């Protein structure tokens, strides 16, 4: 099974045969041809106005080198494109914003995949009143 991305002998990242520098120089439509079908379709059909604004913010933040300030967004369905690599996004999970630092290995995925909307439930020990049968458990 071949991987979409590889790290070569020199430690250089490549995505479907292209280095990160080559990908960042490509137009969005050229990058879309390398993405998986679902992400490619969303780009080819046209990004929404909100997604274009997010890309503009990412371009400005990349030029200013202000990677410390996260870009806040509710757009969990935005595909990760090469312009976003190295930036920090604050992705909304339904309750609050959580930081996601975009790495090269995230190319072709959605922002929402890296911030889960549900947390795992950790139940405590059963005690008095936890269940109907625990009413008869003697106290220590």
Curated annotation (Swiss-Prot):
PROSITE patterns the record matches: RIBOSOMAL_S19
Cellular component annotations (GO), alphabetically ordered: cytosolic small ribosomal subunit
From what superkingdom does this record's organism come?
Archaea
Alphabetized, the UniProt keywords read: Acetylation, Ribonucleoprotein, Ribosomal protein, RNA-binding, rRNA-binding
Coiled coil segments of this chain: none
**Pfam families in the record, alphabetically?**
Ribosomal_S19
GO molecular-function annotation terms? rRNA binding; structural constituent of ribosome
Positions carrying N-acetylserine are: 2
List GO BP terms, alphabetically: ribosomal small subunit assembly; translation
InterPro entries named in the record? Ribosomal_uS19 (IPR002222), Ribosomal_uS19_CS (IPR020934), Ribosomal_uS19_euk/arc (IPR005713), Ribosomal_uS19_SF (IPR023575)
Q: What does this protein do?
A: Protein S19 forms a complex with S13 that binds strongly to the 16S ribosomal RNA.
Family membership noted in the UniProt record? Belongs to the universal ribosomal protein uS19 family.
Q: Tell me which NCBIfam families the record gives.
A: PRK04038.1, uS19_arch
Q: In its UniProt entry, what is this protein called?
A: Small ribosomal subunit protein uS19
